[in-house]
Amino acid sequence: MKLPRDLSGQQLVHALNRNWEYREVHRVGSHIILQTEVPRHHRISVPDHRPLRIGTLNAILRSVAEAKGVTRQQVLASL
């Protein structure tokens, strides 16, 4: 599955909130800090840019997949 080319940081935050139990902890400049406790503590920083760069999006998806114990493709399909 190809990565979306027009996904904004805010859209990614919303999808991670809705589908993967991440919640916004705070903002630092143009970055949104998200955190989850399920299945273990994990914190990520999502830039609030429009659109997100492909490498940045790929790194965030890989990090979420590793923390949740699923594949990157499963995380990507939920966007």
Where are these regions (language model features)?
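Basic nucleic-acid-binding interfaces
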Residues: 1-79
